[in-house]
């Protein structure tokens, strides 16, 4: 039997306190895969998602590891901003004027370029594992493996996601990372035009 790991829409970009609070509140520490070098229950609150995926991929070196996201994933950016607002100790306001809408564009204090650049940094860290590949599509959709998205989303070389996954399953040498470059903030059914200009 072959094993494959697909990480979909989980770049792991969080505000400075969100990760440690989540680990503590959810009691995740005792469940850390501490048999993997570089991962420990005490270190879960500080390890980056990129380092975590790299450690898992290195440990299971014969398992292909694929990470999928969009360059401006609206749901991930929204919750990143929620973490920033919580970290700032702002007074709570029960209004979208504080939290913004879930598409991640009109969030009052959002810094989406930070989310994108950190996602790319984590992706680069994970790419240190020989069995890791990434697929970063343009746009702001959250979760790419559901419904028609799986058969319609394309990467940097116009490779369709479903075909890319099939290359992984076939063990093809053509299975390479497909990351869009110079992706502008999108205009899609889930978003509105943005004035963001991220490199």
Identify the residue ranges that each predicted region occupies.
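C-terminal His-loop and adjacent cap/lid subdomain of alpha/beta-hydrolase
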Residues: 1-199
